[in-house]
């Protein structure tokens, strides 16, 4: 009996977004944990300028506070012809490079998590992990995510939306109160996010947010705990919600919130997994996370972030491809229900293949 060949998995990482380095860190962890008996890994990097290039498995972690970055080698291109799906061409050398069976797009932020690269994969006919074009695009835009969730009857955090470098008027300020959080509408990893405790600091916060996006959200601070729930789709289409994780705080965050350095550099974030919530509330949050996943039409995976107080809760964000670094919440909350990192990846890849 002939042994089955390992599935060839292209792990695509880097990209043009401000979350380039986070993507590299996630990809390094993913490649390290893929079962070599089941999967043959083909690393593909995307430079900050957007060139697809030969990747590598080493050097994708933080060293002495320095963030990893994709270096340009030979340029690569994915075939867009479904008849030759999975074929990758070496543009620099004008020759065939390799073929792959499935793609894991470990791309956070614009040009990766927003439906653009998913459209490329749809054109090529290649199976890929994660949400499709529409769910990725909606999930990337926090304004439209909330509009969709509200239409489905799900509770969301209030917000004001600004575009074109506009600022808040007095009525909006009165509605929001202080403090507020200012964030790019289509960003992640807390990049470009500021906490504003005095209105005279608003313009500086808006300037920072507008550097990342031409649409900005202003949200009031909501008293209560930050609670995160992961959702995993299995090959048969069934959905599993993780236990909730409660963010306990950061040890060194000068910004006063769960910021980029706390998430990826300082390792200053601690979490209670499972969150110390009642059985009833835990079950309700897990169900709401699944409902949010379905409302977006997501696939494969998501992480749903809640604000939870003593008497109520609301959804803050839905992330259609959450961070996969070794200290990211998504792998941790599933480890707490017995789904280890390697099994998590195996499930995601098999789900992508079953969907194709």
Curated annotation (Swiss-Prot):
It catalyses: 2 D-alanine + ATP = D-alanyl-D-alanine + ADP + phosphate + H(+). Pathway: Cell wall biogenesis; peptidoglycan biosynthesis. ATP binds at residues 173-228. One of its GO terms (cellular component) is cytosol. Belongs to the D-alanine--D-alanine ligase family. PROSITE patterns: ATP_GRASP, DALA_DALA_LIGASE_1, DALA_DALA_LIGASE_2. Keywords: ATP-binding, Cell shape, Cell wall biogenesis/degradation, Cytoplasm, Ligase, Magnesium, Manganese, Metal-binding, Nucleotide-binding, Peptidoglycan synthesis. Its cofactor is Mg(2+); Mn(2+). One of its GO terms (molecular function) is D-alanine-D-alanine ligase activity. It holds the Pfam family Dala_Dala_lig_C. This is D-alanine--D-alanine ligase. It is found in: Cytoplasm. Its EC number is 6.3.2.4. It comes from Corynebacterium aurimucosum (strain ATCC 700975 / DSM 44827 / CIP 107346 / CN-1). NCBIfam families: D_ala_D_alaTIGR (TIGR01205), PRK01966.1-4 (NF002528). The keyword Disulfide bond does not apply. Mg(2+) 1 binds at residues 305, 317. Cell wall formation. Its main location: cytoplasm. GO terms for biological process: cell wall organization; peptidoglycan biosynthetic process; regulation of cell shape.
